[in-house]
């Protein structure tokens, strides 16, 4: 989802954060996949996964119990700066665990609730980068835009991703190496090997995954051309 995708309800920012987590870790959503357009993916995910009872984070944990677990929420305290430092520290301490991710809960200057999926902790610059649905311009916690918006972090909601469909080499990324392993039939876990979620492990999984990898590469190249940042 991006800024052109309308929020379905008043918890739109939480929906965005959970949908982005679903995309990032390739969680199954019936009727859509990583090649679907953002609007269709977002609306399908929200209506399919977040339409039950209980909190939305618990609904995600229940729906994807075969792939992840929700860990205990960490509630923060202190000043705005102290809370930002605490959030960074929690994420930095887990930065070596590629399957660990978190959603930050916060309030804004207007008093509204806001949720953001953390992208990664840069331990060199000591910055916590964000995937924020609220603005194109927010990059990391504590930057000028987050201060302008008055972000006040109240909690860190961690998830531990245990399995990622299509990720055969266990690095929690979908790459050409995973495609090669699928083509070589090196399948250790059918749940991981079933990249296209059709309940069958076959060549179609490798074909789908190859399309995803190519699309991701093309998108990264496009972003690099727009920002002059080289593709890693």
What are these regions (language model features)?
Residues 16-19, 168-190, 198-231:
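Alpha-helical segments with a strong preference for the paired helices of cellulosomal dockerin domains
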Residues 16-28, 63-67, 90-94, 185, ...:
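Structured segments of extracytoplasmic/periplasmic soluble domains
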Residues 77-133:
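Active-site-adjacent substructure of cysteine-protease-like catalytic cores
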Residues 97, 121-163:
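Noncatalytic regulatory segments and standalone regulatory/sensor domains
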